[in-house]
Amino acid sequence: MTSLVVAIGNPGRQYVWTRHNVGFLCVDRLVQQFPGVHFKEAPKLFSDIAKVESSQGSMVFIKPRTYVNLSGKAVLAVKGYYNIATDRILVIADDVNQPFGNVRLRQSAGGGGHKGIKSITQSLGSNDYWQLRLGIGRPQRENVELSDFVLGQFTEEEQIGIQSVFIEASALFSQWCSGTQTA
């Protein structure tokens, strides 16, 4: 059985350390657990893809090259190409509705206003996939627009704290892989 792990983020160097790209950063660390596995461009699937074969089946990791708001286009293309069941999809994304550092794993969840999640749900015609949501919090100052906040760089303090988020996310990812997660 093939599983799909989707990182939500924006392509391009200027976005690497932005809050909206925490999904890309997390998936990069997850893929590092598999020696010799690297992302490769797959233009026809609108993604960078890394594939892992294990005793539990195949796992396809993607970083869509469509920008956050159009993530569903890439997810639908990869899902169709590899014939992946919707309930075998895990989407890793930032979450402004959770305090910085909170990590949640849920199935069949709403989008919480996240346009990338909304795009995926619309493209799949279902929300019966898993979400690993990484809390990035909200702006501390009232005069900061939410879009500027999510596209803003992590502070030095957040860059240090994000390492703990990745450790917790990795543990929840392992539970999801083994089927021992709770929704």
Curated annotation (Swiss-Prot):
Name listed for the protein in its UniProt record: Peptidyl-tRNA hydrolase
Places the protein is found: Cytoplasm
Example GO biological process: rescue of stalled ribosome
Record-annotated active site: 20 (proton acceptor)
Major place of residence: cytoplasm
Organism: Chlamydia abortus (strain DSM 27085 / S26/3)
Entry-linked Pfam families: Pept_tRNA_hydro (PF01195)
Any one GO MF annotation of this record: tRNA binding
Its EC number(s): 3.1.1.29
Record-stated family: Belongs to the PTH family.
Gene3D superfamilies tied to this protein: Peptidyl-tRNA hydrolase
Keywords: Cytoplasm, Hydrolase, RNA-binding, tRNA-binding
Enzyme class, spelled out: hydrolase
